[in-house]
Amino acid sequence: ECPKEANAKALDILNKGVDSLSFHVKAKELNAEYIETLLKDICAECVELNFSTCQGHVVELAELLVAYFQKKDYDLTKLRGSINYDYFNKMLAKGKEKGDMVSTAKALLEATASLPKYRVLNVNALTLNNAGSYIFQELGYALAWGNEYMNQLTDAGLPAALVAKKIKFNFGISSNYFLEIAKFRAARMLWANIVASYNPECLRDCENKGEHNECRCAAKMRIHAETSTFNLTLFDAHVNLLRTQTEAMSAALAGVDSMT
């Protein structure tokens, strides 16, 4: 899809009340002109912007976005969004490794250092949900996935608080209404315990830091939820509507940050 058409669609749904946008940018089209056309008339300070591209070009995308935001004179500390870099999902879905996770993650964190509210390390547990996993399997693997980011990057010398604040979880939502509510609430509690085990030190003067200077902000899980495609049928759109509505309501009641 050309950037002009994507921009027009984005502006249309923004006018209808949406406050979070997601864009997929093809690696071969990745340049400053493309980004400018794609984000024309979209105020990056007023809406959450989420981007994905080929895993080998995420650092280039981050650099282009920072340059664009600086050119537009935005306050970079206020911008919210994400860049979908997920080293493990590629192996899970395709059985292939793509580059070195630690070096790419370090470069990505450096490129987005001026964007403190941008999450750039993703846990795409949605893949498991759409493959038919049970709720406990999706939750367990997602937490292990996030812990692996923490483990490898802190071993590489990065502060635990910085790494934790850059991780975003993308969960699927099944039609098991009450258990889905429980899943999201349990995920937040368990992730907070995992992050706390790394003793994240508060990197700035913050009202929310603990009595031993631990960073409580780092323990907050950022969740995007997406309704499942695993249980949809080709033969009855009305059944699909009911299932999707049930899934969306359970995620909303559980307090996810954004939803598709």
Language-model segments: residues:
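Structured mid-domain segments that build the active-site/substrate or prosthetic-cofactor binding neighborhood
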Residues: 193-198, 213, 222-232, 247-260
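Short, well-ordered amphipathic alpha-helical segments that serve as non-catalytic structural scaffolds
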Residues: 149-152, 190-194
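Non-transmembrane, aqueous-exposed alpha-helical and coiled segments at domain scale
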Residues: 211, 234-237
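Structural motif corresponding to the C-terminal cap of alpha-helices
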Residues: 154-157, 195, 199
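Extended amphipathic alpha-helical segments enriched in small hydrophobics
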Residues: 180-192
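Short, hydrophobic/aliphatic alpha-helical segments
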Residues: 237-247
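Catalytic alpha/beta active-site cores
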Residues: 1-176, 180, 206-209, 217, ...
